[in-house]
């Protein structure tokens, strides 16, 4: 680790910790402060001295009363949040100084490095420019329930980061620094005195507003900033400026549109979110226009502008006042529709082009009269925002599970006395759907809604399609079908949109997410392309979503990764053969078992040819805050996506050799068998999950609007992928990320030729390199001792669970050994000392939270409903999530 580069980080952590200590003394008293300090010192000792110190740490915690446990948990949790603020600020500091955060260099690289690599590989400038012009990166913000921090605290944490930035200023004297330190202390005090636990689950509308706030507070500034930065880097390389409407990055959202397994997302909710987005967009553009009104006071104008405004001394302001009036009307109309009030008359902005036209006229006029420098200022920023955000802020995807659509068609066919759609085979379904999609007559009449066949569930799906028809295409993105398995699943949604009278249908995107569905994806899409009407519909492009969460829960990390890779390979080849552009939509989460990985690693480990200048990817939960919560961090991460997409397109990774593929399949077969042997066949696993991990208690934490389970049964199959990962992460066993993989690596190492082959794959094949690197990262966060603490406290008198715990910990140990044999490194993350330091520096603060959590779970199970214990438990869950920097 570079101690000089990271000295300011250590100073910041020390400052924040000292200020937190002051607040703790002031608010909780000397006794609590001294208790926390004793626990911290004992925790540090457990990492250096081992068992005896662990006993003393337990002796400190066990006798504490419930109220003291709560304060202790809050102290350690708050320190971990402050450490994250300091680390995030340090990244911003280094980015401003054009330095990489140590350890980042091998994973994420900016446009300058990529342009240099392209030049070194003799890629023509014309090819680079052409690819950049067509580049399309769409980030889809989702509200998956992994953000444990309340918005009110996030705002305070942002204030702390701003004050740390001010303390970096070299022009401040000591009085000015002391003033900032005092402000920082007050903000930390305010955070300490704020309830860190969300007491009520957010509604889908609350989640959507949270997404809007990320745009308002960060991305609204970051998007024009990153485009200026990219443009400057292209100029430095002698590359032409991109066209004025260049928008390589766009935003979409699932917040308020994702109804898969979430009964709280209804048609009225989706309608409200779409209207709120337009309301927020109008408000943000109004702020821009007010600034432009103040700036564009000049008289000199083109004949074109004067023809539009008439004779005037301030032609720019005349036109901008008209724009302002129409934006105000747009805002009032959206507000009235949301509130259910009479809608004011007048012409609101309904399409991007309507707002773009007057702003482009101003731009042309300024350039025509020699004021290009003025045009390149705030006006250019606004035009760039309009190209990225449109007038709807972002495009809302709709997601629904495939059987909900077939249930509607089953109700319709029974109403029409055609039989039961659900009983038809796939060929019969396809024949019916093709006929109805090409028919000119309506399929059902108004009376269907009043029939016994139109249940509440059927009516809800149809109502959603009617909202799509009413709101129009401007603010809508993809209609994603989860658990898609057959061609009829795709055509069913096309027919439902037709029934609802959708004039500009949403593109229909199948989501392939289980192992079987990924393996069958090519066959499904090939069958669709064999239908002439379907080929015609998707001639301009097809989008397909690859699911990471459910495939990993189904088959384990390694099995899912290989299935995803092969599916993408086959789909890329299929659409290339048919001459149809393909966009792959990656449903990634924060943890590696849900597809999480650094941007460049993720894109360069895709099959060659699968990126092709186009990528769509989900950004979920706490990842949104870490990557896009502050403008400077957002600029950095947006640049990563543009640079990595360009690199993956023009310098695609090496294709897998046949012998690598054969070896990978052997590894996968062993891995899937090992994973399923535990997850499906181990009779005690469900009981272990519910007893030793906080899986049951997680449902009490008001994380998101979506239920933790798809169905009411208590088995693993009904548990969603996010709480499945979250629960194992809390006890540091990280089971979904490694189970089965270790057995596969061990198996290969028993044969010298196979072991050599796997080592070759790890050094030469980007896909497998990514698998190994991500496995190493997650294993470094695992901790056998911590998992054993939970078992001992919560299952110590249960031989069956203790036996299973011992088996799982032995397998984890074997996985670490197998990985070390593969990489040749004695210790995990020897090649990334900064990440190792980042994990280890947090351990003395996460360890007490783990012990506290196990103790609190035990007490709560004896005193169910105790409010103090429940609050303390929720604090430990949030604190551990902060310490590990990911949850689900």
UniProtKB/Swiss-Prot annotation:
Broad class of enzyme this protein falls into: lyase
Keywords from the named record: Carbon dioxide fixation, Lyase, Magnesium
Keyword Transmembrane: no
Single GO MF descriptor: phosphoenolpyruvate carboxylase activity
Top-level taxon of the source organism: Bacteria
Alphabetized InterPro entries for the sequence: PEP_COase (IPR021135), PEP_COase_bac/pln-type (IPR022805), PEP_COase_Lys_AS (IPR018129), PEPCASE_His_AS (IPR033129), Pyrv/PenolPyrv_kinase-like_dom (IPR015813)
Coiled coil: none
GO biological processes: carbon fixation; oxaloacetate metabolic process; tricarboxylic acid cycle
Catalytic activities: oxaloacetate + phosphate = phosphoenolpyruvate + hydrogencarbonate
PROSITE patterns: PEPCASE_1, PEPCASE_2
Gene Ontology CC terms: cytosol
Cofactor(s) of this protein: Mg(2+)
NCBIfam families: PRK00009.1 (NF000584)
Family assignment from sequence similarity: Belongs to the PEPCase type 1 family.
Function: Forms oxaloacetate, a four-carbon dicarboxylic acid source for the tricarboxylic acid cycle.
Protein name: Phosphoenolpyruvate carboxylase
Organism: Alcanivorax borkumensis (strain ATCC 700651 / DSM 11573 / NCIMB 13689 / SK2)
Encoding gene per record: ppc
């Amino acid at each position: 680790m570079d101690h000089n580069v990271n000295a300011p980080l250590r100073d910041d952590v020390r400052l924040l910790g000292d200020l937190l200590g002051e607040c703790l003394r002031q608010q909780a008293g000397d006794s609590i402060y001294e208790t926390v300090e004793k626990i911290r010192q004992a925790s540090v000792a457990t990492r250096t001295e081992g068992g005896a110190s662990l006993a003393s740490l337990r002796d400190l915690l066990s006798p504490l009363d419930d109220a003291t446990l709560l304060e202790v948990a809050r102290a350690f949790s708050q320190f971990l949040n402050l450490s994250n603020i300091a680390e995030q600020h340090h990244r911003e500091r280094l980015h401003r100084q054009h330095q990489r955060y140590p350890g980042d260099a091998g994973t994420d690289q900016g446009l300058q490095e990529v342009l240099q690599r392209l030049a070194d590989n003799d890629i023509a400038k014309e090819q680079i420019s052409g690819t950049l012009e067509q580049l399309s990166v769409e980030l889809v913000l989702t509200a998956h329930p992994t953000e444990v921090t309340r918005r009110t605290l996030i705002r305070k944490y942002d204030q702390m980061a701003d004050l740390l930035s001010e303390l970096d200023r070299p022009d401040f004297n000591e009085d000015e620094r002391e003033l900032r330190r005092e402000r920082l202390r007050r903000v930390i005090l305010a955070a300490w005195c704020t309830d860190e636990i969300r007491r009520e689950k957010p509604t889908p509308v609350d989640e959507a507003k949270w997404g809007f706030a990320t745009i308002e507070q960060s991305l609204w500034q970051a998007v024009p900033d990153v485009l200026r930065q990219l443009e400057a880097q292209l100029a430095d390389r002698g590359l032409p400026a991109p066209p004025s409407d260049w928008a390589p990055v766009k935003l979409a959202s699932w917040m308020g549109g994702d109804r898969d397994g979430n009964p709280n997302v209804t048609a009225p909710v989706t309608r409200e979110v779409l209207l709120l987005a337009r309301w927020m967009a109008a408000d943000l553009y109004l702020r821009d226009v007010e600034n432009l009104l103040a700036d564009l006071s000049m008289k000199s104008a083109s004949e074109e502008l004067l023809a539009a405004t008439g004779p005037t001394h301030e032609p720019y302001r005349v036109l901008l006042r008209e724009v302002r009036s129409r934006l105000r009307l747009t805002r009032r109309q959206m507000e009235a529709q949301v509130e259910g009030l009479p809608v004011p008359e007048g012409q609101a902005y309904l399409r991007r082009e309507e707002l773009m036209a007057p702003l482009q006229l101003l731009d042309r006029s300024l350039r025509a009269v020699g004021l290009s420098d003025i045009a390149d200022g705030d006006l250019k920023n606004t035009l760039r925002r309009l190209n990225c955000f449109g007038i709807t802020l972002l495009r809302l995807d709709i997601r629904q599970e495939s059987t909900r659509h077939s249930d509607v068609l089953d109700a319709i066919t029974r109403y029409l006395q055609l039989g039961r759609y659900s009983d038809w085979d796939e060929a019969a379904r396809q024949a019916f759907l093709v006929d109805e999609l090409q028919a000119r007559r309506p399929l059902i009449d108004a009376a269907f809604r009043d029939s016994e066949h139109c249940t509440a569930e059927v009516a809800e799906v149809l109502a959603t399609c009617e909202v799509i028809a009413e709101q129009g295409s401007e603010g809508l993105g993809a209609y994603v079908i989860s658990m898609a398995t057959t061609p009829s699943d795709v055509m069913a949604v096309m027919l439902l949109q037709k029934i609802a009278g959708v004039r500009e249908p949403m593109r229909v995107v199948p989501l392939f997410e289980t192992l079987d569905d990924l393996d069958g994806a090519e066959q499904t899409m090939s069958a669709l392309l064999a239908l002439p009407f379907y080929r015609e519909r998707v001639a301009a492009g097809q989008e397909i979503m690859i699911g990471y969460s459910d495939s990993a829960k189904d088959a384990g990390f390694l099995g899912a990764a290989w299935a995803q890779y092969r599916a993408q390979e086959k789909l890329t080849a299929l659409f290339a053969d048919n001459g149809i552009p393909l966009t792959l939509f990656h449903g990634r989460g924060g943890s590696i078992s849900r597809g999480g990985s650094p941007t460049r690693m993720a894109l360069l480990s895709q099959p060659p040819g699968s990126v092709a200048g186009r990528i769509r990817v989900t950004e979920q939960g706490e990842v949104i805050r870490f990557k896009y919560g502050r403008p400077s961090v957002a600029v950095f991460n947006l640049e990563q996506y543009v640079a990595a997409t360009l690199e993956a397109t023009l310098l695609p990774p090496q294709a897998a050799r046949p012998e690598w593929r054969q070896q990978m399949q052997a590894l996968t077969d062993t891995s899937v068998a090992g994973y399923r042997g535990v997850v499906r066949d181990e009779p005690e696993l469900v009981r272990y999950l519910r007893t030793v991990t906080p899986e049951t208690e997680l449902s009490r934490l008001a994380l998101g609007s979506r239920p933790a389970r798809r169905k009411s049964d208590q088995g693993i199959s009904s548990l969603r992928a996010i709480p499945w990962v979250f629960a194992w992460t809390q006890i540091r066993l990280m089971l979904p990320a490694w189970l089965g993989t270790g057995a596969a690596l061990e198996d290969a190492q028993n044969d010298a030729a196979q072991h050599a082959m796997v080592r070759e794959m790890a050094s030469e094949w980007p896909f497998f390199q990514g698998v190994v690197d991500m496995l190493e990262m997650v294993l470094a966060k695992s901790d056998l001792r911590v998992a054993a603490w939970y078992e001992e406290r919560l299952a110590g008198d249960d031989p069956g669970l203790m036996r299973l715990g011992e088996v799982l910990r032995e397998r984890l140990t074997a996985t670490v050994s197998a990985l070390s044999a593969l990489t040749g490194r004695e210790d995990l993350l020897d090649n990334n000392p900064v990440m190792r330091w980042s994990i280890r520096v947090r351990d003395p603060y996460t360890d007490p939270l783990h012990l506290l959590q196990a103790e609190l779970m035990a007490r709560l199970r004896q005193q169910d409903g105790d409010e103090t214990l429940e609050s303390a438990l929720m604090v430990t869950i949030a604190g551990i999530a902060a310490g590990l920097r990911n949850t689900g």
